[in-house]
């Protein structure tokens, strides 16, 4: 029988450094994709674990040999970071961690789970499939160095004030009906570190974006054009304006993720200088 016990980081906060080491590998064949979008592809740090909904730990005696972190996604779904298991029967250890996590998620009213697996990490892919998850779609991570850029046309583009929140929310909710970014409100999102942008053309709000800063990298979470204003290059105009604004605010890079089948968005990002860095498969499963 395994000599494991399952605990959590809240009960054993002194193990945070050991737990963090389990997630240390960067993008590549050992990479475990962080479930917090703005942190994807970044070096793992202690604050990443502290901001998770919970972190289950697999202990062999007093030594952490496995971890599985729960990252927020929506009111009914979470994204897992891991499982990372480094000793013994790794699949059995992963099952022990996932069992504890599923019990906690069920008690919290969650319905489903996402896991992102770097497409180069064959071991993680095999494990996630053996755990019963199903591949859904591929997710692509793009980045661009901001640096010195030609002056963007900033006319009509502004950082949203509270008076703009209704217009921003309407555009983002139309473009991303399954996102809960605007719930309960954009004030809370801005308190969480987001910045919102609005493009106004001929007196009408036509495009909006949500950006999160993480160190020197800005993360484009959402960008959308109002339905009646599409086909007029407002998305490109807003994105270039956002990039110019973020440079002035100290960002040196910008990142984003996009589903591989969203060809229109990919064309926009590539046209604005973004380059694909790596890909992940999104797996889903029930709680």
Please identify what each model-predicted range represents:
Residues 1-21, 156-168:
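A short beta-loop-alpha structural element at the N-terminal edge
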Residues 35-96, 209-221, 226-227:
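Conserved donor-binding loop and adjoining core beta-sheet/short helix segment
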Residues 36-41, 152-218:
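Flexible, substrate/cofactor-facing loop regions flanked by secondary structure
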Residues 90-103, 130, 225, 231-244, ...:
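Conserved acetyl-CoA-binding loop-helix of GNAT-fold acetyltransferases
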Residues 106-118, 247-257:
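Conserved GNAT acetyl-CoA-binding A-motif
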Residues 111, 134, 216, 252, ...:
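Short acidic/polar active-site loop segments enriched in Thr and Asp
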Residues 115-124, 256-266, 282-287:
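Conserved beta-strand-loop-alpha-helix junction that forms the acyl-donor binding cleft
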Residues 129-138, 270-279:
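Conserved acetyl-CoA-binding loop of GNAT-fold acetyltransferases
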């Amino acid at each position: 029988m395994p000599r494991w016990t399952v605990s959590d980081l809240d009960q054993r906060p002194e193990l945070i450094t050991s737990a963090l080491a389990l997630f240390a590998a960067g993008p590549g064949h050992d990479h475990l994709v962080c479930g917090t979008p703005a942190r994807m592809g970044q070096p793992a740090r202690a604050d990443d674990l502290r901001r998770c909904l919970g972190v289950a730990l697999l202990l062999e005696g007093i030594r952490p040999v496995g971890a599985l972190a729960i990252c927020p996604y929506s009111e009914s779904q979470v994204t897992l970071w891991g499982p990372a298991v480094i000793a013994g029967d790794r699949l059995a250890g992963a099952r022990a961690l996932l069992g504890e996590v599923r019990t906690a998620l069920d008690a919290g009213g969650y319905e489903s789970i996402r896991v992102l697996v770097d497409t180069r990490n064959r071991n993680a892919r095999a494990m996630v499939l053996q755990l019963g998850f199903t591949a859904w779609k591929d997710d692509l991570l793009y980045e661009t160095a901001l640096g010195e850029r030609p002056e963007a046309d900033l006319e009509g583009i502004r950082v949203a004030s509270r008076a703009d929140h209704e217009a921003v929310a309407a555009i983002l909710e139309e473009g991303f009906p399954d996102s809960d970014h605007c719930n309960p409100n954009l004030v809370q999102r801005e308190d969480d570190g987001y910045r919102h942008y609005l493009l106004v053309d001929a007196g009408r709000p036509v495009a909006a974006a949500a950006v999160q800063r993480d160190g020197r990298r800005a993360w484009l979470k959402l960008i959308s054009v109002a339905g009646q204003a599409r086909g007029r290059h407002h998305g490109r105009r807003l994105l270039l304006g956002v990039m110019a604004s973020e440079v002035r605010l100290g960002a040196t890079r910008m990142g984003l993720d996009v589903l591989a089948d969203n060809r229109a968005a990919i064309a926009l990002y590539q046209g604005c200088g973004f380059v694909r860095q790596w890909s992940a498969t999104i797996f889903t499963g029930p709680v």
